[in-house]
Design a protein with these regions (language model features):
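Nucleotide-activated sugar donor-binding and catalytic core shared by glycosyltransferases
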Residues: 1-150
Length: 150
């Protein structure tokens, strides 16, 4: 028998529906934890240990890609959809679209695919770090130092 996944929902400090989410998760038939704005080092460890993730776009998308975490993206806005489209074009995420138009069926199919398709997860795991290497700040600092020196 297959072991149910260890599910964890992580929300930021600006998320307004934390208590509502916790109540909804308590009704879910699989054990799931809700963490609100964990310390960065703990969040990093959670991301690193994840078999897969569902992200809402933003900076988290870059962090998960850099760490090689296979990720499905549900975008809150069309603006973030453009970013997710570029990530998906580089085979770095599974883009499920904008949440307002995302059907429950499409969401479920996407998540099931992410969890069951080992080839897809392997592809996302390797493409993410190729797209986001985590060294952007170093490149910016080097460029600024070069500009200051000239």
């Amino acid at each position: 028998m297959t072991q149910p996944p260890d599910l964890r929902v992580v929300v930021g400090t600006l998320f307004d529906h934390h208590e509502e989410l916790k109540r909804a998760v308590e009704r879910y038939p699989v054990a799931c934890r809700v963490d609100r704005a964990p310390p960065q080092d703990r969040l990093f460890r959670m991301m690193r240990a994840s078999r897969a993730a569902i992200a809402h776009g933003g900076d988290t998308l870059y962090e998960l890609a850099c760490l090689g975490v296979p990720t499905a993206v549900v975008c809150p806005t069309v603006r973030q959809l453009r970013v997710a489209d570029r990530f998906a074009g580089a085979a770095a995420v599974l883009n499920l679209g904008v949440h307002r138009t995302l059907t429950r069926s499409r969401f479920q199919r996407g998540i099931i695919r992410l969890l069951r398709d080992t080839r897809l997860r392997r592809c996302l795991r390797t493409a993410g770090p190729r797209l986001v290497d985590g060294r952007g700040a170093q490149r910016v600092a080097r460029t600024l130092a070069e500009l200051a020196a000239s």
